[in-house]
């Protein structure tokens, strides 16, 4: 007889229709559900850590490069438009224990102007987004996160 272990997974507990908040889908790499503020620079991360110490910060990039390691390390989550399970973003985020979604194909980041577009919808730096590092989904706004047990029979 085999005993299957259950594990706790962070999932979203939507108070409204999730389809109304849906921004896009990518490849879930690591972590579970996370809601936080969208950020683009190390300076923004440091400012939010002072202004709102308890908030999660989600770094957005079209793609990451090795020079982004400080930002990735300082942020709580990572969202990229490109990449796969073996991409720089995915490997580093997984190794650092960060919630991460890569290859969100309808995401376009303008790092210089500090905003992202999901199709026609613009999300600016400091606004809330929600990512699911297990499912790969991305949602607009701050969403309640709960712990769910998975894998038990």
What would you call each of these model-derived segments?
Residues 1-153:
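Non-catalytic, soluble scaffold/interaction modules
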């Amino acid at each position: 007889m085999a005993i299957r272990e259950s594990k706790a997974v962070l999932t979203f507990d939507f108070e409204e229709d999730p389809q109304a908040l849906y921004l896009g889908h990518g490849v879930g790499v690591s972590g579970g559900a996370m809601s936080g503020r969208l950020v683009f620079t190390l300076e923004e991360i440091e400012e939010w850590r002072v202004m709102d110490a308890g908030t999660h910060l989600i770094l957005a990039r079209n793609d990451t490069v090795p020079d982004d390691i400080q930002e990735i390390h300082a942020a709580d989550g990572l969202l990229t438009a490109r990449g796969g399970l073996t991409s720089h973003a995915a490997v580093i985020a997984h190794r650092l224990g960060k919630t991460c979604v890569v290859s969100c194909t309808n995401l376009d980041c303008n790092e210089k102007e500090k905003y992202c577009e999901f199709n026609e919808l613009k999300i600016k730096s400091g606004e809330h987004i929600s990512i699911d590092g297990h499912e790969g989904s991305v949602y607009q706004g701050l969403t309640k996160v709960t712990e769910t047990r998975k894998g038990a029979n």
